[in-house]
Amino acid sequence: MEQVLKRKVIRNSQHGFTKGKSCLTNLIVFYDEITDSVDMGKAVDVIYLDFSKAFDMVSHSILASKLKTYGLDEGNIRWIESWLDLRAQWVVINGSMSSWQLVSSRVPQGLVLGPVLFNIFIKDLEDGVDCTLSKFADDTKLGGEVDTLEGRDRIQRDLDKLEDWAKRNLMRFNKDKCRVLHLGWKSLMHHYRLGTEWLGSSSAEKDLAVTVDEKLDMSQPCALVAKKANNVLGCLSRSIASRSRDVIVPLYSTLVRPHLEYCVQFWAPHYKKDVEKLERLQQRATKMIRGLEHVIYEERLGNWDCLVCGRQE
């Protein structure tokens, strides 16, 4: 497998389960290009694509064929085929259990090898695609400028190519969950189809758990993050009896602060009101520590990092 990876089979557009890449790199790289176009006054359409049970639909025979094409030796291919094919499953419906059946598709997600095999399987998804395509495992999005008829046709041609790839590789798009986000004030709100079905438009979409809206305004994700973190902080306040610093600080750092910092380099608030909304969470958390209830915030911080200061740096 290492020899395959050394040949750079997994493309730069794939950020999932890839060394040195993450949800953050996926968002920053994709939207950096998209926002450049919007800043120049261009209209841009982004199509969010959703595969139906992506990992479960990977055909073992097609995967083996691709591994051979990408240069993996026969011995390793046979080992992988044995690892995948010697799996069986049964189902229960209304209390009746089926017989055991060998599984001819699916790569396991709980092991390191499974996601790597999926990345290899989906590598050629973008062959022939002209617009910007970005992947995080099976989460896929396609974007391009649509000021001109040619730009809109280019996106439609790419969608046709992606649908054709899915059919050839025995995969399916969940078209009810595929959405179009129109960006830029010149947007014509063009309609696209995937196969024979027209895709719905949306004013905001969750992309890798970060909300992106048609105005590229980060106040909404900021508010959602603050609400989620506030809920966790409220649960801690109600359920934790101890109010010692040694208890509150680790719990806050482990359960609350990650919500505030997940991909924050991408959605970092630009408005003072949004920054202060996040900082109030930490102010509330420091008040939970016994003996600090009436101490001013700057002194309560102690060795805690100030969220506002961290973002200003």
Predicted regions and their residues:
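Mobile genetic element proteins and their domesticated derivatives, centered on retroelements
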Residues: 1-4, 30, 50, 67, ...
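Short, conserved micro-motifs composed of acidic
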Residues: 95, 157, 172-206
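Active-site palm subdomain of RNA-directed nucleic acid polymerases
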Residues: 1-14, 115-144, 243
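Short linear motifs embedded in intrinsically disordered, charge-biased segments
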Residues: 272-313
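Catalytic palm subdomain of template-directed nucleic-acid polymerases
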Residues: 53-70, 131, 140-167, 269
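Basic, alpha-helical interaction scaffolds
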Residues: 199-266
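Conserved pre-catalytic core of RNA-dependent polymerases
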Residues: 1-108, 144, 305
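Catalytic palm active-site di-aspartate
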Residues: 14-18, 44-54, 80, 106-114, ...
